[in-house]
Amino acid sequence: MSLTLREASKDTLQAENKTWRYYSLPLAARTLGDISRLPKSLKVLLENLLRWQDGDSVTEEDIQALAGWLKNAHADREIAYRPARVLMQDFTGVPAVVDLAAMREAVKRLGGDTAKVNPLSPVDLVIDHSVTVDHFGDDDAFGENVRLEMERNHERYVFLKWGQQAFSRFSVVPPGTGICHQVNLEYLGKAVWSELQDKEWVAYPDTLVGTDSHTTMINGLGVLGWGVGGIEAEAAMLGQPVSMLIPDVVGFKLTGKLSEGITATDLVLTVTQMLRKHGVVGKFVEFYGDGLDSLPLADRATIANMAPEYGATCGFFPIDSVTLEYMRLSGRSEEQVALVEAYTKAQGMWRNPGDEPVFTSTLELDMGTVEASLAGPKRPQDRVALSNVPKAFAASNELEVNAAQKDHRPVDYVLNGHQYQLPDGAVVIAAITSCTNTSNPSVLMAAGLLAKKAVELGLKPQPWVKASLAPGSKVVSDYLAQARLTPYLDELGFNLVGYGCTTCIGNSGPLPEPIEMAIKQGDLTVGAVLSGIRNFEGRIHPLVKTNWLASPPLVVAYALAGNMNINLATDPIGHDRKNEPVYLKDIWPSSREIARAVEKVSTEMFRKEYAEVFEGTAEWKAIDVVGSDTYDWQDDSTYIRLSPFFDEMLAEPAPLKDIHGARILAMLGDSVTTDHISPAGSIKADSPAGRYLQSRGVERRDFNSYGSRRGNHEVMMRGTFANIRIRNEMVPGVEGGMTRHLPDTEVISIYDAAMKYQQQGTPLAVIAGKEYGSGSSRDWAAKGPRLLGVRVVIAESFERIHRSNLIGMGILPLEFPQGVTRKTLGLTGEEQIDISGLQNLQPGKTVPVKLTRADGTTEVLDCRCRIDTATELTYYQNDGILHYVIRKMLD
């Protein structure tokens, strides 16, 4: 009997006097043919298939198809990818644990073994999304924000502690430690994973999926991973492989070096703009070229982090000597570093100078051409040269819907006993935030050095600026202190406010009341400048209409200038003690100064801060939970509720039902994000969710955020399509979650309309433009519509994660025929929709969609089914991926 490829490829290697078994790609190549020029990212996938070959979920034909990708730099085949581990943050992690607990209830009700609902691979949940910038600008800010976080989220944290003891291989990194992606980069990521199997140590690539779209940051360490929805991550941790098509791989060649004064942030904004224009949705991006020789790992991680912003599944940097240097710096053991080097060299995954893999398509960037940039005011891919920011702000200001804003007159206000004028274009938030940049010592040291020069010249921030510093790990505080830069940042208001995502995810906290009142009184267009990765409208703060992504030193600079109308390339940023003008170039640190400061970063800092990473504060340790297999649901809880998704589930799936007489709940434009569909930020008192919380006795000050309430479906379904900036074309000129209920045409909230339709037994549809569901890997952007009764979404195109999430929740994603849009069809939202033949649905094939207009005329469209794989079709036929997993457990 001939050996399988898996068995035939077994080999051993030596590292640090230890023997490791592994599945050798060179041995497999004796059967598969030459794979030396396969992109490194696909070699990781190939090893994954080889190691998991079982003749069922992974066959020799699957392995042959991936190796054969080289022939056309493309392959049309579905494969089953099994990541080594799962990463979560608390906004997505809490609902995931709610789902797991609800699955145990369903398995128990259907007569199965609840012990089967347990992770089969390691799961790390980092609590980083809950801290809010309530206090800022003084030494007490950090302590006060931590205290408030623990008070507000006590119930959620009790639940997560229950999950930690109830589920195996499930670890929680407590609040106040850092941001999940930076903790992953600095500590959790191994580059090469290993485990004891049958008394042998087995080595294989470190791979993962995460419940946050920026999981891709770890690609900078040569670890293949990307963001998925919570439901897909839950299935993965329970042993279900991730179904995917073999991806196209776009090669991005980097050459040269960054010019003096140019930062990694400027580079990533340029890369994002180029790749978004190229079109990389659903594709891998792999970086290569001699520019990598001098590109620090922190810069690579910054670029990899923004893969969701350029639309790619991942932004992969192969492992090389730069990777090993970073692993040593961040405190990984010499045994681990030696294993990574030996393994990747043996497998042909090591990057050598001059490597030119085969790619589907390529781009090239000479890093010497990158210029100082921001991105904004509403999308991360809209890069603006520093010198053009005032023009970009003015252009966006003119587009504001309220014509009464034309005057843009300053508004007088009083703050702390002093009178000021708040001008149009004021920078009211300046935040050094997000792991994208706070994982990068060079840009943080640059911010500190710029602050030092500014303070020494007597410059001060403008009084309306809310400044904050929220690093992604405690190591940042250590090296800023070691470089003696912390006092200067404090002097300019950039005091430590927390170790977490804060402003970048909308946890910017309230502005001082006089400033909020002035913005409302003058209907002013104000700005936020942040070192983050997302600037979608309504995300950072409800009153801030323009949001700009910038490097940390530019964040400090804009706090000093205080206005988006100031041209920092040519105008003074302020005046010194002698009233002489000071320009940005006068306080911008040189690359030599930055390099000297970065030398202060030491391995001891990483080892000290990560020695007790799972321990937490005294408040965390004091949280006590009772051990049990199933959760004790509390009827009066407004944070944690038993989700209803499995209430009516049977052991066998029912046949698919056609959709008849569906009404359109919302008709939306292009680039509708998951933030629009399911916001994470503040809850308005007069919204359906706000009214629900008040009816349950929750005071307005205790609303917390939508993100923190994701364990309660009652809040989340009411918050679906509730973003204050969403524009439903069925109600022109109206912003917010409103729609027309048909046929009576009453204008009411989307939630109230959906409930009326449910009472009438009417299925619902959503119509949209291009890039529907871009942004965060937010499974509530699919769960919420499902609970509202949405059966189908018809769009011009979908972003990858959201399309998958829709299928995972039993919602059908369809694409309009090429060249056909809601506008070319003249849709008003009054149409009714019929979709028949769903029992004969095929991946990627066309589906007839019948439109019946208000006047009775009809039209049939052949829409493309965006269920892309046979496995996804199976999930859809089971009413969702978790229903499928439960039924497998019952077999």
Task: Please give the residue ranges for each predicted region.
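Terminal amphipathic helices with adjacent charged low-complexity linkers/tails
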Residues: 82, 100-156, 286-287, 292-402, ...
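Long, structured ligand/cofactor-binding scaffold of large enzymes
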Residues: 54-257, 264-269, 372-375, 394-494, ...
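Extracellular/luminal Protease-associated
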Residues: 288-295, 533, 754-755, 759-799
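Acidic, glycine-rich flexible loop/linker segments
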Residues: 576-591, 803-875
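N-terminal amphipathic, basic-rich helices that act as targeting or association modules
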Residues: 2-148, 295-305, 309-333, 383, ...
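Extended C-terminal subregions enriched in glycine
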Residues: 464-486, 490-494, 498-503, 507-509, ...
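Mobile "lid/hinge" segments at catalytic clefts and subdomain interfaces of large enzymes
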Residues: 199-341, 350, 443-463, 495-609, ...
